[in-house]
Curated annotation (Swiss-Prot):
It is found in: Chromosome. Residues 63-97, 137-171 form a coiled coil. Disulfide bonds: none annotated. This is Synaptonemal complex protein 3.
Length: 224
């Protein structure tokens, strides 16, 4: 064998010892490098496992958050839909009440015999003139007082009519602003919620892609 031949050809035992020492040193150095490489690979595997675990946990957390946000948005949408339906129903109710109040006002004005009040006053006045020509001074005073009382009653009825008209007008004026929505979600608000939800989903996808790139980079480092 070449090794035995080399030993047999050595000048002295010292050279062989030196050779064996160098061989042992080289072997130990090689073993140390191998151990360092294996340690580095274990560290990389640990880091990769930690990264994968962190990524999995992050994905799970994001999914929980997205599910909670989606549930919250769905509840908000249901609440807004219910509010919108309620407002629509209130609007229809106010419209019906406004129309009813308007019809009642028109009917009241039509049925209120304002012209007959003037005619009645004229009849009383003509009757007074006729009575003045036929009655004594005391009777005339009595008729005058009666006419004055009738005139006062007509003025009271006139004021009552004016108050009723003012009340109906005030009621109509109060109903008109109430028809305008005071709460609930407009199209702009619903669109804003949709954009926010879309942004959260896009952000989650971006984070997922970033983690995937980190994973591919770690795999590439392990394969080299």
């Amino acid at each position: 064998m070449n090794f035995e031949k080399l030993v047999s050809q050595a000048v002295n035992g010292d050279r062989f010892k030196i050779f064996c020492g160098q061989l042992t040193e080289f072997t130990n150095s090689l073993a140390g490098e191998r151990e360092a490489i294996e340690k580095g690979m274990r560290q990389i595997e640990t880091q990769q496992l930690e990264a994968e675990t962190s990524f999995t946990e992050r994905i799970a957390e994001d999914r929980v958050k997205c599910a909670a946000q989606r549930e919250s948005l769905e509840r908000q949408l249901q609440d807004l839909t219910a509010t919108d339906n309620k407002l629509s129903e209130q609007k229809r109710d106010w419209e019906e009440r406004q129309e009813k109040a308007y019809d009642e006002l028109m009917s009241y004005l039509e049925n209120e015999d304002v012209d007959s009040a003037g005619t009645q006053f004229g009849d009383h006045f003509n009757s007074l003139i006729k009575s003045m020509n036929n009655l004594s001074h005391d009777s005339m005073n009595g008729q005058f007082n009666s006419l004055k009382n009738n005139l006062d009653e007509l003025n009271i009825e006139k004021k009552q009519l004016e108050v009723a008209i003012a009340d109906q007008s005030s009621t109509i004026s109060e109903m008109i602003p109430s028809l305008r929505p005071t709460c609930g979600a407009t199209y702009k608000e619903r669109n804003t919620l949709r954009i926010i939800f879309h942004y959260q989903v896009a952000k989650l996808r971006s984070e997922y892609q970033k983690c995937r790139l980190q994973e591919e980079a770690l795999k590439a480092r392990l394969s080299t």
